[in-house]
Curated annotation (Swiss-Prot):
Protein name per the record: Ribosomal RNA large subunit methyltransferase H
Keywords carried by this UniProt record: Cytoplasm, Methyltransferase, rRNA processing, S-adenosyl-L-methionine, Transferase
Chief location of this protein within or outside the cell: cytoplasm
InterPro entries the UniProt entry points to: Alpha/beta_knot_MTases, RlmH-like, tRNA_m1G_MTases_N
E.C. number(s) listed in UniProt: 2.1.1.177
Protein purpose: Specifically methylates the pseudouridine at position 1915 (m3Psi1915) in 23S rRNA.
């Protein structure tokens, strides 16, 4: 199984790249994890936000292909770390690759939400999307460590 993080936005600050890359390099070779960045639509005073969301969503879904789609969204399920580890195990048993979708400033398109098999809420708080990349990578690495009895996670 391959994990794929599909996120709106490019040219992240150095701290985001450093944090994300740190966890990315820790993943084992039998569970590759990749980042696909989708360019954010141009937003301005008179921007058509629905059109922008739809275009971003179209690009995200194209990147995900036939993968299992999991959206990151405030109304999603708030998995704790052991629950995320269980989900990771289920995904592995399913055999398909998994694409986790992070929307842009206005969130995800309705098409992305409709295509999702699951929705995961990191928090009831609104989080900056660059930070979410790092949190997702760390959370998935921690979940993997639980499933393999790696000493990274301590109860």
């Amino acid at each position: 199984m391959k994990l794929q993080l599909v996120a709106v936005g490019t040219k992240m600050p150095d701290w985001v790249q450093t944090g994300f890359t740190e966890y990315l390099r820790r993943f084992p070779k039998d569970m590759p994890f990749e980042l696909v960045e989708i360019p954010a639509g141009k937003r301005g005073k008179n921007a058509d936000i629905k059109r922008i969301l739809d275009k971003e969503g179209e690009l995200m879904l194209a990147a995900a292909g036939k993968n299992r789609i999991v959206t990151l969204d405030i109304p999603g399920k708030p998995w704790d770390t052991p629950q995320l580890a269980q989900e990771l195990e289920r995904w592995k048993l399913d055999g398909r690759d998994v694409s986790l979708l992070i929307g842009g400033p206005e969130g995800l398109s309705s098409a992305c939400k409709a295509a999702a098999e699951q929705s995961w809420s990191l928090s009831a708080l609104t989080l900056p999307h660059p930070l979410v990349r790092v949190l997702v990578a760390e959370s998935l690495y921690r979940a993997w460590s639980i499933t393999t009895n790696h000493p990274y996670h301590r109860e």
